[in-house]
Amino acid sequence: LCSRDRLIKGQTAFTKWSDVLTKIELAYGVERNVLLAIWGIETSYGTTRGEISILSALATLAFDGRRRQFFEAELSAAIEILHKSARFSSQFKGSWAGAMGHVQFMPSTYLNHAVDFDGDGIADIWSDSPIDALASAASYLSHHGWIPSLPWGSVVELPRHFDYALTAPNIRKTVSEWVDIGLKALPENGDAMGSLILPMGATGPAFWISDNFDALKRYNNSNSYALSVGLLSNAFTTNEYCHLQWPTNIKALSKTDMKTLQTQLTEQGFDTKGSDGIFGPNTELAIRAFQKRNAMIEDGFPSLGLLERLRKNQQ
């Protein structure tokens, strides 16, 4: 998501919409680089907004049944939008999941957070102009805890012999406290609170993340998404491609393997609170407890090696 091509196109968009982004930043306190990154990742700066009928997409998903209540509510919200403004009927298109416009709002998000920033009397996130859409994204982040001028996070360098138990999600420290532990490349705000994450375990990059990272996850509840937005936003500042050395020898667990891992952990006394094949906080805590019990690096990462270790324990 954070590619060289997206950076170059974003720089062009930055120049074109610079004055608007400045005004939005002043109004909502959300940095222009972050808004530009969201726009770039969601729709490649408005070039891929989706061509599927929103009503058809939501009706299909509601009928499918896996998240019926959620999509029925979104379908109701979509109908409400059209009831309020029939002018959107010809533009009412988006993704297969029902997300709409330059910044891919769901209908309920539009009703709650869309704003008319250009002053034409209507919050239009579908038009060729991204002004209302970018302001609406800023409005959303502002309402979900975005703190002005606080860095979302940074790539950090861990000291030798680092205690990976400190990367548990419930451990938060100030920047100054992390520096005292030996971390490098942290933001300059010594009082800022944050925690550490290891998206690929102990062998991959480490990140310090702040409350603004959590605000980005309210937009899309995925560490990968929030990291992509954050890294791309940084790239607009440095004008450098956001390239990191990710491990190439680590294969992500399939959903079936994840279910097996969760089942094995629970059977061995480390309750994951269910085996749904989705890696979440309960599974991470169970993994960390297993790793601690077995004198392993406590990075909470669901690797194939961990799954094999669990299987051997059952033999």
Q: Where are the predicted features?
A:
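Glycine-rich, acidic and aromatic/proline-enriched surface loops and short helix-turn segments
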Residues: 44, 84, 102-115, 143, ...
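Acidic, glycine-anchored loop motifs typical of Ca2+
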Residues: 117-125, 277, 300
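Secretory-pathway/luminal and periplasmic proteins that interact with or process carbohydrate-rich
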Residues: 43-53, 64-68, 84-90, 104, ...
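Cell-envelope/ECM-targeting effectors and their regulatory/trafficking segments
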Residues: 47, 60-64, 77-81, 164-315
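Export/targeting segments at the very N-terminus of extracytoplasmic proteins
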Residues: 3-41, 51-52, 56, 60-73, ...
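Substrate-binding/active-site groove segments that recognize
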Residues: 53-62, 100-116, 137
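Phosphate/pyrophosphate-binding betaalpha-module
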Residues: 65-104, 109
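Ligand-binding pocket segment of bilobal, Venus flytrap-like solute-binding proteins
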Residues: 123-177
